[in-house]
Amino acid sequence: TYLCENCDVLSIHCYQPADEMQRFIDLMKTFNRPIFCTEYLARPFGSTFETVMPVLKKEKVAAYDFGLVKGAMQCHYEWNKVDADGNKIPFTEEPELWFHDILHPDGTPYNAAEVEFIKSMTKK
């Protein structure tokens, strides 16, 4: 509470579906500070552009996505994937559902419909 009451801007991360994002934003709004969501995309967790961006836009929360182009950081892989015993599961193939990232290294979209949705949400 002290930190939120004494900072100029609130920077949040939320990798949850839209309803959880809304609850988190509602809580942060009680501090009457501008809110920046600096990480939110986690497709396997239900946090997608299509579900979360409308909430962010409605609440006037500034936001940007952590990943852009699939590359050396391998943000298209889900982090902390572990088995029932807590052992890290290595990735042996390309994930069907990317975690972060929007574009392939050649600039083509991972999901063209998703890119069109992003464009539609960012128009004035």
Go through the PLM ranges and name each one.
Residues 1-124:
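Substrate-binding clefts and catalytic carboxylate motifs of secreted carbohydrate-active enzymes
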